[in-house]
């Protein structure tokens, strides 16, 4: 493309190349819209087709996964690994197992991951992978056979200095263990090829908690910069996976009153707030097969909003931790009308672009996921460092490093997002991540 093209011309170019990849196009639009004024002031970043290279993955691997279920029926799923950018290190990003997974979603996640990893300042590139396999309702044997079948193809594309996957939606410690074990068997090599491993074979303490803890560390720093804090605040959390669980736990430690949790069936509202005991019980219920927040609400006699998200509940701080685009314009209007002060993304791009703009126009503090939920991948980087050194750090050391990294990310966002009365954290995160990746790409030439 001509180096003098406009923002809309560039976005149309991306849309034309992949007209059906709406999630990916949305991610590119969100990033480029905030970057464009910076790019116009710094024309060196529009040389050598850098932007065109930045939105094109270095490699996309697509393959079939053939496995046998418990009824002895042959099943066929699709799987992908998007190796988006290795400009600053090996590809790094999770594996997602969910029926909604497609190439557009994985490209969007890999694109976001590239900037998120850059923000951590650790030497990690961006990648993402997954399959349309649904682990819900599957036996442990079926999940194991699927993971092993997937690795018979994927293993050849991974390596400690090439591509290091981790977990994501539908992929927890169990699935990581199955995949890492099969990788070791196929490659005859025990080098670190996954993070999020069990503690018995190279995992890191604090890794399961890291995204949720990091989200709260970043949000607390953002609140403090604007004269507030978690202490005494009403907080709503969506979802109840790892991110939501540990965000609730850490927010309670900081003195917040967390009043919601949710799953695909609906939302539980506890006006008195979670306690350690209540949280432990909800975790226990959700860990059981087919356990839902509705069961928890019934047990404790709490309000249950069937089929609804938590955004209609009046709160000071909202932490969307479920999935992409869960918080739309209508939800944003409800939160703003109810006086929300801050929104921080625990999931990957859970807020639509239009909702994000509404929050910013209303003066609501907004922390984008690439900054606020970077704690998970940051601790994955720390796990890689421990594996490379053949060491295991104490939980306190990992947590302290995580807290420090999240404060550094917050500082970078403020530096590039404006140090005035209210920081534009979306702009700050996008520019800070972009500059690191772009400088590396320029230094390495046209490759």
Regions inferred by a protein language model and the residue ranges of each:
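Adenosine-phosphate binding glycine-rich loop
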Residues: 2-27, 222, 336-447
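Structured beta-strand/loop patches that form or line metal/cofactor-binding pockets in enzymes
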Residues: 44-75
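Phosphate-interaction motifs
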Residues: 63-124, 128, 132
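Glycine/serine-rich phosphate-binding loop and adjoining beta1-alpha1 elements at the start
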Residues: 98, 117-231
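General beta-strand structural signal in soluble alpha/beta enzymes
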Residues: 162-166, 190-194, 237, 260-263, ...
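Glycine-rich phosphate/diphosphate-binding loop of Rossmann-like nucleotide-binding domains
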Residues: 195-198, 203-314
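Rossmann-like adenosine-cofactor binding region
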Residues: 266-366, 371
């Amino acid at each position: 493309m001509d180096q003098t093209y406009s923002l809309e011309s560039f976005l149309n170019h991306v849309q034309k190349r992949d007209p059906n990849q709406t999630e990916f196009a949305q991610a590119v639009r969100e990033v480029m819209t905030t970057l464009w004024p910076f790019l116009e002031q710094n024309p060196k970043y529009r040389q050598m087709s850098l932007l065109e290279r930045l939105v094109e993955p270095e490699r996309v691997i697509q393959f079939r996964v053939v496995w046998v279920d418990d009824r002895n029926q042959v099943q066929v799923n699709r799987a992908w690994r998007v190796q988006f950018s290795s400009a600053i290190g090996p590809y790094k990003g999770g594996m997602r197992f969910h029926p909604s997974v497609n190439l557009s979603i994985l490209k969007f996640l890999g694109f976001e991951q590239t900037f998120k990893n850059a923000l951590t300042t650790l030497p990690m590139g961006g990648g993402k992978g997954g399959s349309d396999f649904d682990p819900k309702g599957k036996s442990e044997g079926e999940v194991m056979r699927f993971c092993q079948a997937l690795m018979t193809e994927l293993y050849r594309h991974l390596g400690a200095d090439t591509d290091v996957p981790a977990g994501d939606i539908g992929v927890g410690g169990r699935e990581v263990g199955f995949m890492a074990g099969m990788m070791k068997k196929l490659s005859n090599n025990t080098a670190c090829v996954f993070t999020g491993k069990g503690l018995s074979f190279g995992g890191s303490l604090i890794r399961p908690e890291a995204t949720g803890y990091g989200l709260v560390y970043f949000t607390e720093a953002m609140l403090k910069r604007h004269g507030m804090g978690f202490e005494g605040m009403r907080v709503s959390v969506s979802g109840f996976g790892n991110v939501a669980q540990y965000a609730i736990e850490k927010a309670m430690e900081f003195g917040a009153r967390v009043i919601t949790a949710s799953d695909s069936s609906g939302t539980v509202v506890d006006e008195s707030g979670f306690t350690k005991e209540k949280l432990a019980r909800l975790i226990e219920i959700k860990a059981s097969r087919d356990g839902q927040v509705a069961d928890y609400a019934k047990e404790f006699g709490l309000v249950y909003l069937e089929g609804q998200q938590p955004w209609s509940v009046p709160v000071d701080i909202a932490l969307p931790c479920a999935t992409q685009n869960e918080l739309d314009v209508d939800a944003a209007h409800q939160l703003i009308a109810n006086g929300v002060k801050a929104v921080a993304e625990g999931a990957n791009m859970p807020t639509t672009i239009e909702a994000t703009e509404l929050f910013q126009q209303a003066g609501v503090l907004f922390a984008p996921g690439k900054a606020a939920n970077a704690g998970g991948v940051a601790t994955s980087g720390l796990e890689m460092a421990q594996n490379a050194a053949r060491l295991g750090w104490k939980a306190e050391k990992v947590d302290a490093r995580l807290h420090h990294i999240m404060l550094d990310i917050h500082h970078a966002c403020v530096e590039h997002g404006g140090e005035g009365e209210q920081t534009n954290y979306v702009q700050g995160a996008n520019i800070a991540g972009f500059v690191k990746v772009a400088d590396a790409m320029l230094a390495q030439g046209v490759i």
